[in-house]
Amino acid sequence: MAPNLRKSHPLLKMVNNSLIDLPTPPNISAWWNFGSLLGICLLTQILTGLLLAAHYTADTTLAFSSVAHTCRNVQYGWLIRNLHANGASFFFICIYFHIGRGFYYGSYLYKETWNTGVILLLSLMATAFVGYVLPWGQMSFWGATVITNLFSAVPYIGQTLVEWAWGGFSVDNPTLTRFFTLHFLLPFMIAGITLIHLTFLHESGSNNPLGIVSNCDKIPFHPYFSLKDILGFTLMILPLTTLALFSPNLLGDPENFTPANPLVTPPHIKPEWYFLFAYAILRSIPNKLGGVLALAASVLVLFLCPLLHKSKQRTMTFRPLSQLLFWLLTANLFILTWVGSQPVEHPFIIIGQLASITYFMIILILFPLIRTLENKMLKY
């Protein structure tokens, strides 16, 4: 009998083992769809980004008008730009759901997969930040100035570090050029790390909502989950196209319709919505270095998840106290996001500080305590 090419060809064999004959737990829910959605987001962003880069000029005098030119004069340039800008928002929606799912169902116990995932999140955040600077509007310029300035909080080498990042004594042409270079490079790096992420995942196999070993009961990925993923794609592409076609500027900042002007500071400098929770944590500490450390810790704390897992059960499915804490953490993140979008004045300052303390307290103190308590209650 002739060998099955899908299973014998060196390249097709890899595809087959990852996407077709991959043994998958039969009970994984829709929360497991976000990984494939992130893959689609990455492909969409790379494709639309390449088309935008073909018409973009990385020069302070031309960047703003080159983006306007793309939207006005290039065939479907407006659509490509709107899909790219809003695609970033969907990328973050998917990654936050994906992380939340991993946190809820104890997927962080696959340490290598989890750690590469956190590195992917950091890379995505860096990519989105440098990308936001490229249209060279007011918020692009001042966002770049404020965030890169944070490096000056590093003791001893801070100022040198900032000037090295800027390529001069302020955010200017060299900064824009290198940010464009980084924005072009990073998505391909993300694609590479994604392959490492998947390699580690396929070493152990997927987790499932019950958090139990499912080796004795698995089904092939295709056609069951390939079809389920296609449903996920449609359900994501629908709101993305709706947003890009009906209200493309809904999530953007009106300040970015004004070309960058180093002499005029916008009344309220704030990042895109997906960074607001971290921005609120940064602002809630009056000390510059302290704020920078808290900002870094707000994301790097994810690396500690496997170490803080004290429960004898993997998932939160049968742990109502942990579930309550999880949803409190979610609500707290929404509060931080809202506070980050508000001006720095009386009620918002104290709300931000309380929400920041609560954020770290829930993750670092309350979760391990509740997990230990649940073990005692279940007589483990």
Swiss-Prot record:
One GO term (biological process): mitochondrial electron transport, ubiquinol to cytochrome c
TM segment ranges: 34-54, 78-99, 114-134, 179-199, 227-247, 289-309, 321-341, 348-368
Binding site for heme b b562: 84, 183
UniProt: heme b b566 binding residues: 98, 197
Alphabetized PROSITE patterns for the sequence: CYTB_CTER, CYTB_NTER
Keywords recorded for this protein, A-Z: Electron transport, Heme, Iron, Membrane, Metal-binding, Mitochondrion, Mitochondrion inner membrane, Respiratory chain, Transmembrane, Transmembrane helix, Transport, Ubiquinone
Residues that coordinate or bind a ubiquinone: 202
Cofactor needs: heme b
Residues in coiled coil: none
GO-annotated cellular components: mitochondrial inner membrane; respiratory chain complex III
Cofactor note: Binds 2 heme b groups non-covalently.
Subcellular location: Mitochondrion inner membrane
Highest rank taxon of the organism: Eukaryota
GO-annotated molecular function: metal ion binding; ubiquinol-cytochrome-c reductase activity
Topology of this chain in the membrane: Multi-pass membrane protein
Predominant location: mitochondrion
Family: Belongs to the cytochrome b family.
Other notes: Heme 1 (or BL or b562) is low-potential and absorbs at about 562 nm, and heme 2 (or BH or b566) is high-potential and absorbs at about 566 nm.
The protein's assembly and partners: The cytochrome bc1 complex contains 11 subunits: 3 respiratory subunits (MT-CYB, CYC1 and UQCRFS1), 2 core proteins (UQCRC1 and UQCRC2) and 6 low-molecular weight proteins (UQCRH/QCR6, UQCRB/QCR7, UQCRQ/QCR8, UQCR10/QCR9, UQCR11/QCR10 and a cleavage product of UQCRFS1). This cytochrome bc1 complex then forms a dimer.
Record function comment: Component of the ubiquinol-cytochrome c reductase complex (complex III or cytochrome b-c1 complex) that is part of the mitochondrial respiratory chain. The b-c1 complex mediates electron transfer from ubiquinol to cytochrome c. Contributes to the generation of a proton gradient across the mitochondrial membrane that is then used for ATP synthesis.
Name the UniProt record assigns to this protein: Cytochrome b
